[in-house]
Amino acid sequence: METTASVVAELNVALGTDYRLVRQLTGGLQSTAYELTGGVVLKWTGDPAWAPRVRRAAELVRRARAVGYPTPAWLAVGTTAAGSPYQLQEFVTGSAPTLDQALARQVIEICELQRDLLPEDHDVSWSGWSHGVVFDGWDGVWERVQRYDGEAAELLARYGALCRPYRDHELPHHDLVHGDLNMGNLLAADGRITGIVDIEAAGGGARAYDLVALAASAARDGADAGVDELFLEAALRANGRAAVAVCAAAGFASVAEFVHTRSEQSQDMVNHGGRRLLELLDA
């Protein structure tokens, strides 16, 4: 069975390097991050199915950084002999902030850099996934959450009603979408955003997806008052109400399922974020 130590040893052989493990970093949910010597961060996952997505994300990181999007540079991308994908990134100083309105406005400006970064068409985008989850039963997420007891299913029904007029609406596909943008994936130091991490799920879609996710995170994760509303207003300006509604609904369904087997507190926090977005959308 692979361990972080064995992955470091293997990539040292492959790359001709001498990295050593320093510590596990906090933040980020898609795969665990580790600081190595030499100002380098290792991220890896034991799921070989993630390898194509990681390789695709490497190109999107390059594009994003070229326009000033502050995600760390990727230094190397590869797979272990067992097929586990990994990437080496530059280490960026900072820690996950509690967002105030000044930092939130910085993040909104950063999200505007995502506009039209993927002019080419893609087989699957975050907009396509969101529409499919809400209207076409993709992955079975919507149906599973509908069967839950308690508030999550009630909120999902409200999201379904909110989205109903937009079934035939074409959502934007050409923005860069981070795909998991929340307060835990931001880094800040000295009053400024220094990094956006955990970007392996990046793809095309509507940048409103990320702004809506930030609004929900702000509501549930303790941001200053009004920050959630700033993000939602930015999402509406970016891509309009149809995209915001469908992205919010799909995002809520996905996160509600993610926390369903976790603590009651986690479920309550997710429900609070989902409820707050509905309130802001008058739905």
Regions found by a protein language model. Give the residues of each.
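A cross-family kinase active-site recognition segment
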Residues: P72-G83, F91-L155, A161, R167-H174, ...
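Active-site activation/catalytic loop segments of kinase-like enzymes and analogous catalytic loops
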Residues: A208-G240, A249-Q267, R275-R276
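Structural motif at the C-terminus of the N-lobe alphaC helix and the adjacent alphaC-beta4 loop
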Residues: L60-Y69
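Catalytic-loop of the protein kinase fold
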Residues: L176-H178, M183
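ATP-binding glycine-rich loop module of kinase domains
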Residues: Q30-R53
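Juxta-kinase regulatory segment immediately upstream of eukaryotic protein kinase catalytic domains
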Residues: M1-T17
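ATP-binding glycine-rich phosphate-binding loop
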Residues: G16-E35
